[in-house]
Amino acid sequence: EKNKSLSREVLAVIAVPCWKKEARKDLQERLKKKNGIKILDATECSPLPHPFITHELYNFESEKIVSAIYNCGLSLSKNSNIHLLFIPSYLDGQDGIINMPYYDFLTASDYCIYPSYYEPWGYTPLESIAFGIPCLTTNLSGFGQWVNTQVGHQAILSDGVAVIQRTDNNYEQCACEIAVSIQGLSMLSDLEYIKIQEAARKLSLKAQWKDFIKYYLDAYTLSLKYNATNRQ
């Protein structure tokens, strides 16, 4: 069924490498035939088993992402306005289904979600905004903490990066905040979204190596001094 709170269709992609075997043969066959199938006819094809996943898994029955997909009550019907794609493979351009390098795939996104429970820094959200793709992360990532200091408050979507508060006990709250954030982005006009993209790119320029290298040099200098002192 359609989610009435959404004003447009949403393709939610879970691109997380897992214990995969190989690309799905049945899906590859469908993709080979797609050029010879009229678009209208293609929508009438019967769904594949477990239609959301791109690759075979060694541990399909016990994979937590698969279990969550089936347990959350999300409709996998083609009539739904929320569509799910689970890619359990590294995107190196040769995965057998997507066949596109990660950075090319990234630029096709509208919003990237990195709900870190622990991340000393986090380069993936920085890469996202460098390409002008807004993202969401948490205050438990070094990147999220840095963003908050740069904007002077808990960052929100209009800053180019949304930073939510995550603790040991607020998993459900975070999930709801992420859903609300995605819904909010889906309701933006083209002009509003472009402004957020511009904010994301502008923020990424503050995290270049020419600005950060001094911190690495300071850290290495302190490490060498500490090591020399311990050897005396």
State where each predicted segment sits.
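A structural signal for short, well-ordered beta-strand segments and their strand-loop junctions
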Residues: 11-15, 114, 137
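C-terminal alpha-helical cap of glycosyltransferases
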Residues: 209-232
